[in-house]
From Swiss-Prot:
Residues 67-96 are annotated as: Disordered. GO terms for cellular component: cytosol. Residues 72-87 have a biased composition (Low complexity). RNA chaperone that binds small regulatory RNA (sRNAs) and mRNAs to facilitate mRNA translational regulation in response to envelope stress, environmental stress and changes in metabolite concentrations. Also binds with high specificity to tRNAs. InterPro entries: Hfq, LSM_dom_sf, Sm. It comes from the Bacteria. This is RNA-binding protein Hfq. PANTHER family: RNA-BINDING PROTEIN HFQ (PTHR34772:SF1). PROSITE patterns: SM.
Length: 96
């Protein structure tokens, strides 16, 4: 489960921290708008004129009003590990 959230958490946290307005599209087509107040593994608390708790399993897409700069060191190390694995696999194939 941690691998699935390695991009999600820093992205949502950047949206929350920078108070970037977002449009959240649900799987049934409904569009919600507001700012991300908080989130956890299962829900996002969206703040507009009222607070709404939106279950993540109901979300299709999160669209920020402007671009977001999120930095994910764990994602970079995952990418490096992946590249090292690919290189090792390639070397093993050549040796065979």
């Amino acid at each position: 489960m941690a691998k699935g959230q390695s991009l999600q958490d820093p992205y949502l946290n950047a949206l929350r921290r920078e108070r970037i307005p977002v449009s959240i599209y649900l799987v049934n087509g409904i569009k919600l708008q507001g700012q991300i107040e908080s989130f956890d593994q299962f829900v996002i608390l969206l703040k507009n004129t009222v607070n709404q708790m939106v279950y993540k399993h109901a979300i299709s897409t999160v669209v920020p009003a402007r671009s977001v700069s999120h930095h994910n060191n764990s994602n970079n190390s995952n990418q490096q590990n992946y590249q090292q694995e690919q290189q090792t696999d390639s070397n093993v194939e050549k040796a065979e």
